[in-house]
Regions:
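Short secondary-structure junctions
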Residues: 27-33, 93-98
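Amphipathic alpha-helical segments
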Residues: 14-29
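Short, conserved charged micro-motifs
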Residues: 17-18, 79-84
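Vicinal oxygen chelate
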Residues: 86, 91-136
Length: 136
């Protein structure tokens, strides 16, 4: 069996605003909001499910308002990378070459590809790269 990530829950202060920004930056569509999630379909096997309501999962209480920053990394093609970088720049958002340099307005070039990092709503750090991290 092939293992694929099916979905991940992204804590947000405002699930709709966070999902809309993510969809806009990545050139994706946000699904109509139903229930507690604002979903963005990333590809045929992955959705980013933005949630802004606390929930008690028996022994695991979960509150998006108290969740720390998460890091989400995406591998994309050159055309998608250029589009995402262009939309980040058009919004006047800071971006950079590394997780500790995500505001230096530089594009990292390593492993034969390009990488940028930038913060989105709720201070999550997104990484967009053109080469998989497992490549060399």
């Amino acid at each position: 069996m092939t293992i694929r990530l099916d979905h991940t829950i992204v804590p947000a202060r405002d699930k709709v605003a966070a999902a809309q920004l993510f969809a806009e930056l990545f050139g994706l569509e946000m699904k109509p909001v139903q229930g507690r999630f604002a979903q963005v379909v990333v590809n045929d096997s992955l959705t980013m499910d933005f949630a802004d309501e606390a929930e008690d999962w028996d022994t695991i209480p979960w509150d998006p308002a108290k969740t720390e920053s998460h890091h989400y990394a995406f591998c994309v093609g050159d055309e998608e990378f250029d589009g995402i970088l262009g939309r980040v720049k058009a919004k006047g958002m800071a971006y950079g070459s590394g997780p500790r340099a995500h505001r230096d307005r530089q594009v990292s070039e390593r492993r034969g590809g390009r990488t940028i990092y930038f913060e989105v709503l709720d201070t999550h750090l997104l990484e967009v790269r053109t080469q998989p991290s497992m490549a060399g």
